[in-house]
Amino acid sequence: MAEIKVGKNETLDSALRRFKKQCSKSGVLSEAKKRKHYEKPSEKRKRKATEKRNSRK
């Protein structure tokens, strides 16, 4: 989980911006989107195979 400490003279906007950046770097949102619905292991293998094939092109 992403965690930041807000400085004394730091505005809420800048703290929120830092928090969002840290969340995107750690992959929290993408992981939550993946886990929103259950993905069967066979579907996961198919998806990874197609991603691998597409990345080679």
Swiss-Prot record:
A molecular-function term among this protein's GO annotations: structural constituent of ribosome
Alphabetic keyword roster: Ribonucleoprotein, Ribosomal protein
A GO biological process held by the record: translation
Gene Ontology, cellular component aspect: ribonucleoprotein complex; ribosome
The species this protein was found in: Natranaerobius thermophilus (strain ATCC BAA-1301 / DSM 18059 / JW/NM-WN-LF)
Region Disordered: start-end pairs: 22-57
Name recorded for this polypeptide: Small ribosomal subunit protein bS21
Family of the protein in this entry: Belongs to the bacterial ribosomal protein bS21 family.
Database matches in InterPro entries: Ribosomal_bS21 (IPR001911), Ribosomal_bS21_CS (IPR018278), Ribosomal_bS21_sf (IPR038380)
Residue ranges with Basic residues bias: 33-57
